[in-house]
Amino acid sequence: MSFLMDSVIMFTSQVLFFGFGWLFFMRQLFKDYEVRQYVVQVVFSITFAFSCTMFELIIFEILGALETSSRYFHWKFNLYVILLVLIFVVPFYIGYFVVSNIRLLQRQKLLFACVVWFTFMYFFWKLGDPFPILSPKHGILSIEQLISRVGVIGVTLMALLSGFGAVNCPYTYMSYFLRNVTESDILALERRLLQTMDMIVSKKKRIAMTRRQMYQRGEDQNKQTGFWGMIKSVTSSPPGSENLSLIQQEVDALEELSRQLFLETVDLQATKERIEYSKTFQGKYFNFLGYFFSIYCVWKIFMATINIVFDRVGKTDPVTRGIEITVNYLGIQFDVKFWSQHISFILVGIIIVTSIRGLLITLTKFFYAISSSKSSNVIVLVLAQIMGMYFVSSVLLMRMSMPLEYRSIVTEVLGELQFNFYHRWFDVIFLVSALSSILFLYLAHKQAPEKHMTP
């Protein structure tokens, strides 16, 4: 009876997560597009629901909610479903919709979709060759073989996002990095934009007038010269056509310039708004957070470097280790085990909420940046793939943030994986991503004032 009640609780929560994923799809991702393929919406919502359920099971593990056998069953069931979706369903539909957008392959799109899926499976399986994740004890389609490969991709994505976020967050929040933008700078750039638009309009008028004159001149020549005039018009280009192509090239160059000026104007407006916002109480609060994140970023880069150089992986979770160091330093009586469990629960909860929120915000921005009416279905499925792999990898890495007694069932469910490898791999990619982001933001920050100083 208890297993049935536990299953009802899990099923109800999955329905709620599915509904939230459905609403997010409709209200955020597809609010500017017509939903033509409901299978995309269903696949995205299922991926979101089972991804969130894994985090729910981690919280239940710490709280001791549900029966141990029930939690183990739902861990296994959840992992098999999410792996089925990530390895079989989503890649197949990505291939199907990519092929559907190619006219030459319309008649055999199911066949070519299968070809795309088999290609994905080949490279997905070959991914295990250069990494120490394979285990000869398990079969080809065992859960360990699948999770290990999904984990490599997901941990790489997590490390890239974390490295960029650790650098970009203080850069975004701190007023120290803001350029000094005045109203006169914006007005000067807007004036240049308007002048460019006027030049485009005048040149397009010239093109229209020239084409009209060429058309009228051609009509007159056909009426006057008859058959020989037609032969001449075919063998020779009409007068003014060379000048017309030259003007069209100038228009194309001016339109590209106008696009750049428009983007620079929007950038200056946003910077000016950020300067005004930084003077408010909330802006000063985020400025303080920026300094805090700067210290965190430096510490994280330093620790990642230490872990890589000395091949080090923590044995205990950070909370327990931090409390032990503090208690030993202060020399006070303190129940480390009791409080580490509660603080770990709060920390894991914060990590879960911020991970889901941060990923959804990133996915929304990415979708609006590159989507179109034709590619939107493919992009949503790619985002679902990224989201699922990201959350599976979060469970792999979050295991280290849990006290030792709560790791056992997670370790048992995930199988005999090389957990230390994933932590070292995360440190390597995080360090590369963070240092690359520092270099990129430094060059962008240095180049921006020079760009706006040009007359």
Curated annotation (Swiss-Prot):
GO cellular component, as recorded: Golgi cisterna membrane; Golgi membrane; monoatomic ion channel complex
Keywords: Glycoprotein, Golgi apparatus, Ion channel, Ion transport, Membrane, Protein transport, Transmembrane, Transmembrane helix, Transport, Voltage-gated channel
Subcellular location: Golgi apparatus membrane
Keyword Lyase: no
GO MF term set: voltage-gated monoatomic anion channel activity
Signal peptide annotation: none
Xref: Pfam families: ABA_GPCR, GPHR_N
Primary site of residence: Golgi
Catalytic activity, reaction form: iodide(out) = iodide(in); chloride(in) = chloride(out); bromide(in) = bromide(out); fluoride(in) = fluoride(out)
Annotated glycosylation sites: 180, 243
Membrane topology reported for the UniProt record: Multi-pass membrane protein
Sequence intervals crossing the membrane: 46-66, 79-99, 111-131, 150-170, 290-310, 343-363, 378-398, 425-445
Subunit structure: Homotrimer.
The family this protein is said to belong to: Belongs to the Golgi pH regulator (TC 1.A.38) family.
Official protein name in the record: Golgi pH regulator
Species of provenance: Salmo salar
